[in-house]
Amino acid sequence: MKQFKVGGIYTGEDRIEIEVLKRTKQTITFKYTKPNWWEEDTEKEFRKKIRHFNNNYETINLGSHWSEPSVHAN
């Protein structure tokens, strides 16, 4: 299974890019690497719950609705 690694940079939908700062078994703490339409504050740290997609890779949803952007550990 592909997992998020601390220090890794991952690109999601709509060219959203994040850098993983910390990781636990169930959550990751990250910041955005560049401004984007979703979030302009790139210095703020965010924490989201990790979800598993078909045991192939980990993913996080950036919003609370299924249609909002997500980032996968590829």
Question: Locations of the language-model features?
Answer:
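Short coil-to-beta transition motif at edge beta-strands of beta-rich domains
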Residues: 1-12
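Intrinsically disordered, low-complexity, charged/polar segments
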Residues: 37-74
